[in-house]
Amino acid sequence: MRLFLAMLLAAGPAAADTVIAGKSAQALRCAAYIGMAAQYGHAEGLVSDEDRDLMTFWSVLVLERWLPLAPEDRMAAYRRALGELGSRGDTDTLIARHADWCLETFQPAL
């Protein structure tokens, strides 16, 4: 997981013309929802360190399985998706609305 975080921080800019659609786009959004839920929940004391790490790892596995891009482009797309989530209130609403579907639909390969 630390490797993922390092890659996330070091990821360079992806090609701006990359279009992510269909299941890949859904998986990308789901990874962002679960990743942010982990961070928000942990910051508020609602999610343990272990659960935050597990949720973050889930996001990594989903991105690896469902987003067919080079690792640096995948991380750049994830960072863009996180940036597009909007305000905290909007993000909380999206997480509440879609988290269960995301977890059922995108089973990471273990």
Language-model features, listed with the residues they occupy:
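Short N-proximal segments of mature Sec-exported proteins
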Residues: V19-L69
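Processing junctions and N-termini across compartments
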Residues: A10, S24-A25, A96
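Compact alpha-helical subdomains of small soluble proteins
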Residues: E50-L110
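Residue-level marker of positions within ordered structural domains that often coincide
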Residues: A10, G35-M36, Q107
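Sec-dependent N-terminal signal peptides
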Residues: R2-G12
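Sec/Tat signal peptide C-region and signal peptidase I cleavage site
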Residues: G12-T18
